[in-house]
Amino acid sequence: MSLQSSIRADSNCTLPNNPVCVLLPVDFIVAAMASSTSSAMAKWAAQAARGFAAAAPSSGKGRKVAVLGAAGGIGQPLSMLMKMNSQVSSLSLYDIAGTPGVAADVSHINTKAQVKGFDKDGLAEALRGCDLVIIPAGVPRKPGMTRDDLFKINAGIVRDLVTAVGQHCPGAVLNIISNPVNSTVPIAAEQLKKMGVYDKRKVMGVTTLDVVRAKTFYAEKNGLDVASVDVPVVGGHAGVTILPLFSQATPKATMSAEVLDALTKRTQDGGTEVVQAKAGKGSATLSMAYAAALFADSCLRGLNGAPVVECTYVESTVTDAPYFASKVKLSTEGVDKIHDLGPLSDYEKAGLKAMMPELLASIEKGVQFVKGA
């Protein structure tokens, strides 16, 4: 199949610049890049592929993926993006309401993943045999709410869904999106420990949106091609616990202390920026779905044997915090290696110290939610 024939016949879809055309399976884009005789096409394909961490293998075991909370603001676009991932052979979409419509809609996309929708009585079947489970379920942020305000509702949702994962697919890799991630990941870990099926390599909090934002803001400020930019983001996934390491960003750019501080704070407050811009009508659903799809793609490539390094929030000994986001190597069993933080600037050292009280308190809150139940 040619690249041209794979794109919907649409007079508004022209190569190489129309963004509609970018929505192709990553491994297909890489293949097109390799075979194209057009240098412009090759450049376009390479830029599209670099939205993901690294070039995906063109083949690999088809994986069963479940999205829990598939009818929500994040779940719907995430379900579409996972349907487009060529590493997915079976896609289970679960929610307490609205799933049949989402599943029917997504199933019409002409990619190989077979889609099934499940309602509140179908969770066990949705999870059975899954390799990867993504959890965006829960209530979204509203104006004036912090991630911690979501705890009372989302903590119970995550605990109950993770219990089902422990019962029906205990070996699956877990990607937890539901906020507050600083607490919901410890909740997931403690619940799986309680059930005797915890594997620290397979429970990950999705902090990729912080990385995506840091890359975007850094590239914009310094006039760089965002596709060539890398910025590690460590710590947690809320406010001051989000610490972009701009001293380790590539390509290198010289920034004043004022600019550095502004970029850091914008990365930390990115979620609030979107909530306020939507004026009470939503949160960062689209960018979160995009970031979650990037991270899920990396997890799938890791499961299929490709060496992948991503930032994610996991059980860790890198700092005094028992859970911490940093660069990790993903492999066939989940997290294979947790990287050290590397050299930090004085500004970053101060940020690391400042985040600890809040991060530790959020972790303990999650732990006690399960232990005290």
Curated annotation (Swiss-Prot):
PROSITE patterns per UniProt: MDH
Active site annotation, chain numbering: 237 (proton acceptor)
Cellular location(s): Mitochondrion matrix
Keyword Mitochondrion carried by entry: yes
Keywords, in A-Z order: Mitochondrion, NAD, Oxidoreductase, Transit peptide, Tricarboxylic acid cycle
Catalysis: reaction(s): (S)-malate + NAD(+) = oxaloacetate + NADH + H(+)
Highest taxon of source: Eukaryota
CDD domains the record matches: MDH_glyoxysomal_mitochondrial
GO CC annotations, alphabetized: mitochondrial matrix
Pfam short name (any one): Ldh_1_N
E.C. designation(s): 1.1.1.37
Positions of substrate binding: 141, 147, 179, 213
Top enzyme category: oxidoreductase
Residues noted as binding NAD(+) in the record, renumbered to the chain: 69-75, 95, 154, 177-179, 288
Complexes and interactors: Homodimer.
Alphabetized PANTHER family for the sequence: MALATE AND LACTATE DEHYDROGENASE, MALATE DEHYDROGENASE
Protein name: Malate dehydrogenase, mitochondrial
Species lineage: Eukaryota, Viridiplantae, Chlorophyta, core chlorophytes, Chlorophyceae
